[in-house]
Amino acid sequence: MQRQVVFATSEMYPFSKSGGLGDVLGALPLALHRMGVPTAVVTPFYGRLRTADYPIRLTVSDCHVGYPWAPITCDVFEADYHGMPVYFIHRGEYFDRRYYYNDHKGDYFDNCERFVFFCRALLALMRRLGQPPAVLHAHDWQTALVPAFLYFLRQTDPFWQDTRSVLTIHNLAFQGRFASRLFETSGLPPQAWSVDGAEFWGDFNLLKAGIAYADKVTTVSPSYAREILGPAYGSGLDGILRKRAHALHGILNGADYDIWSPGNDRFLPCRYTPTDLAGKAQCKRALIEELGLDPHLARRPILGFIGRLRGQKGIDLLLDILPRLMESDVGVIILGEGNLTHEARALELMEAYRGRVCTIVSYTEDLAHRIQAGSDIFLMPSRYEPCGLTQMYALRYGTPPVATAVGGLRDTIVPWPSPESTGFTFGRCESAAFLRAILDAVHLWTTAPGDWQGMVRRAMAQAFTWERAGRAYLDLYAQLGVSPGEEGA
């Protein structure tokens, strides 16, 4: 039996998704699978799991999850996703809920217990299936204990001796930080409770444990990997990251162009390509009509924002400068939800500038596609951005971004006025700098249509493929001395 790369994740599109993590885990494992790498994914069986297109079946009943004090069981379901197995850990008391991590009252009180259980259940499933993986690849705090458990299991259990671990950090700000008493019930050995392990200012930090014990740690862009080594972006974990700097790598995410490409997008009223951009103008007119914007905006630039309405995404900067933008006779579309104060303010501005500003406080996948296609300029004023996917989508849709020069935004956008420019960036994350960059973009759109069309075509030619990212991860696995696909013992 060939040894697999097994991905541990709390989300995987199309089965579950709350943000970019789901997109990544719907694409990267599949890219490796298509490259001939034996690959599997393990994820929770949520109450609102989307399985209509991929029927699931019970594959393991009463899988025993070993805890020091008592056995707990779970059922495991399986789906065939384009020939790749996806396993779903089912235990109703933990995962049969409307949302993944929180509701309107806040984070679920038992999140630590839920995801400690998931990590232990994944390891129990591998045992039950009888074949140790070549690589266990965990993602974010929810699965960060997989590398930690593996580190200690390798010391006592020959089954795991040749398995290596990778932890990918998609956003360092979300760490899974809990009360210290929950460490005692996690099943980690006492020696893991240290400043070089799971302990963080007296709390139990799941992400820190994963960073400490994973064989390799990755982030989702080279720039972000450098940024998190310092206090400005390190979210308190820059110390442990510097200690593990030799094991830290930045690998840029890819974009799923099977889904996000204007040449084959089923959500668009008209498709288009770099050699035939007429469809983009038609998408713009259709979007103006759909959202009830003033028809004259077909002859003016439309600025699109898609993202969570939270401080990290810089939505407050956009709201601050929006009245000033109205003086330039542009349209603004905001799609997203998040902080209630930002939501209310965005809706108030829509009322104040009705016909020129449209705020949709929700997220729908189909409308996101149409905004990418129908906008002229995409706004991404993130205070930090580990990688970012929406700017990659904007580039492919010929919608040059205006973005902060941080993290993955720095790695994916060539800024104006370079002859190879694909967008606009600004250095200081503040309203004045953001406004200047937008006005530069509006000026180019208005006064130099030939230069603008050149930028649009260069943007659409960018290719941040998952195959490229997959090859980088295979190189990383090779550094660990493992070759997925080799026959196991």
Swiss-Prot record:
GO molecular function, one term: alpha-1,4-glucan glucosyltransferase (UDP-glucose donor) activity
Transmembrane region(s): none
Entry keywords, A to Z: Glycogen biosynthesis, Glycosyltransferase, Transferase
Residues annotated as binding ADP-alpha-D-glucose: 17
Entry superkingdom: Bacteria
Reactions catalysed: [(1->4)-alpha-D-glucosyl](n) + ADP-alpha-D-glucose = [(1->4)-alpha-D-glucosyl](n+1) + ADP + H(+)
Pfam families the record matches: Glyco_transf_5, Glycos_transf_1
Gene3D superfamilies per record: Glycogen Phosphorylase B
GO BP, sorted A to Z: glycogen biosynthetic process
Pathway noted in the entry: Glycan biosynthesis; glycogen biosynthesis
Protein family: Belongs to the glycosyltransferase 1 family. Bacterial/plant glycogen synthase subfamily.
Functional note: Synthesizes alpha-1,4-glucan chains using ADP-glucose.
Stated name of the protein: Glycogen synthase
Organism in which the protein naturally occurs: Nitratidesulfovibrio vulgaris (strain ATCC 29579 / DSM 644 / CCUG 34227 / NCIMB 8303 / VKM B-1760 / Hildenborough)
Gene of this entry: glgA
